[in-house]
């Protein structure tokens, strides 16, 4: 059994410098807000307050502010729960900073997203490497999705996951306060993605040990292998493991030959011989190019430049010839550099 971590919340670990760093991290891309500027303008004072809240165990979570959005990528309705900047968001960052290096070391290598250095590009390179170097064990793919992953991870499950990893009672109490501040993992909390990854640690281990290659991006995951029957038999183990955490798979899981259908994940479709852009993303690209031709703005120039830069990751020669003909990159850069 892996040794549990202790002595996390101590005078030596929770320093004013750590609290200042946490406040600055929490303030990124929010510096125009009055509530954030007020804290940054009195950084020393607020860092001392934050330190005492954590060391004394007097932190109490505030109510969340609910916000409704439509996710442009998937066109799904999302409900965000925004915590107050101080003390809540700052406490969340301190809580993760205290254990981040040791937590990262325990997470699965290919459990990606919301971890610095492990984004879409990291996942893309991993899948491409497997397909290019191991054709035998990438013949079939099992593609699944965990149903309402964040909504179904409950506070008691988060608490149990941390108790297996950490024995410091003060730190466990802090984590439980954050976890029990909502009925599930709220979209909008910095801690939510870390909590999810820790809860799914045993699940990741099971998948990794029973398949040739495994990758999980938030709640979507793929398992690759040479035998279709083995992948199908693995479904029962996966379902039982998830059930222990109060989770279950969507019914639209798929087992298919990679060469015939391609692996649709991370915004691409992967084949052994090439990679294509996902159809939905290609449509967004075409619309962006069409809007640019109709009316040129700095925002549209930046959006189009970003998508053009992304073409190096997939087979895009025919796409560029058909939909980007006549678009001048120098003109795009000139518009993108404008402030308004």
Where are the language model's segments positioned?
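Conserved polymerase palm-domain catalytic core
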Residues: 125-218, 222-239, 256-262, 298-332
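Inter-domain linker/hinge segments that demarcate the starts of reverse transcriptase
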Residues: 50, 54-58, 234-245
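Short Gly/Ser/Thr- and Asp/Glu-enriched loop/turn motifs at secondary-structure junctions
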Residues: 62-64, 215-219, 252
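Non-catalytic, polymerase-adjacent accessory regions of viral genome-replication enzymes
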Residues: 1-48, 52
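Active-site-proximal segment of RNA-dependent polymerases
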Residues: 1-9, 96-154
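Active-site-flanking structural segment that lines cofactor/substrate pockets
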Residues: 43-77
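Short, conserved non-catalytic motifs in the polymerase core
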Residues: 29-37, 65-90, 106-118, 177-197
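A conserved non-catalytic segment of reverse transcriptases
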Residues: 245-309
């Amino acid at each position: 059994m892996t040794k549990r971590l202790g002595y996390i919340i101590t005078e030596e670990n929770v320093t004013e410098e750590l609290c200042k760093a946490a406040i600055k991290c929490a303030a990124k891309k929010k510096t125009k807000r009055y509530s954030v500027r007020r804290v940054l303008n009195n950084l020393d004072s607020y860092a001392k307050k934050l330190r005492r809240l954590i060391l004394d165990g007097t932190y109490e979570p505030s109510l969340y502010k609910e916000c409704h959005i439509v996710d442009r990528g998937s066109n799904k309705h999302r409900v965000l729960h925004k915590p107050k900047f101080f003390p809540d968001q700052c406490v969340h960052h301190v809580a993760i900073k205290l254990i981040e290096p040791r937590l990262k070391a325990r997470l699965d290598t290919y459990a990606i997203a919301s971890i610095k250095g492990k984004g879409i590009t990291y996942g893309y390179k991993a899948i491409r490497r497997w397909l290019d170097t191991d054709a035998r064990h990438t013949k079939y793919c099992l593609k699944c999705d965990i149903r309402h992953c964040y909504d179904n991870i409950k506070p008691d499950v988060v608490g149990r996951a941390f108790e297996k990893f950490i024995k410091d009672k003060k730190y466990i109490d802090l984590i439980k306060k954050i976890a029990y501040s909502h009925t599930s993992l709220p979209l909008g909390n910095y801690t939510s993605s870390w909590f999810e990854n820790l809860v799914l640690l045993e699940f990741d281990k099971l998948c990794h040990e029973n398949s040739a290659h495994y990758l999980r991006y938030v709640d979507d995951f793929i398992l690759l292998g040479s035998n279709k029957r083995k992948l199908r038999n693995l479904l029962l183990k996966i379902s039982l493991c998830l059930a222990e955490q109060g989770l279950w798979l969507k019914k639209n899981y798929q087992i298919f030959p990679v060469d015939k259908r391609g692996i649709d994940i991370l915004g691409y479709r992967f084949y052994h011989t090439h990679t294509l852009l996902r159809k939905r993303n290609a449509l967004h690209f075409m619309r962006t190019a069409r809007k640019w031709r109709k009316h040129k703005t700095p925002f549209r120039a930046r959006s189009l430049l970003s998508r053009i830069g992304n073409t190096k990751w997939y087979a895009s020669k025919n796409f560029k010839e058909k939909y980007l003909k006549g678009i001048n990159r120098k003109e795009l850069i000139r518009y993108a550099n404008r402030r308004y």
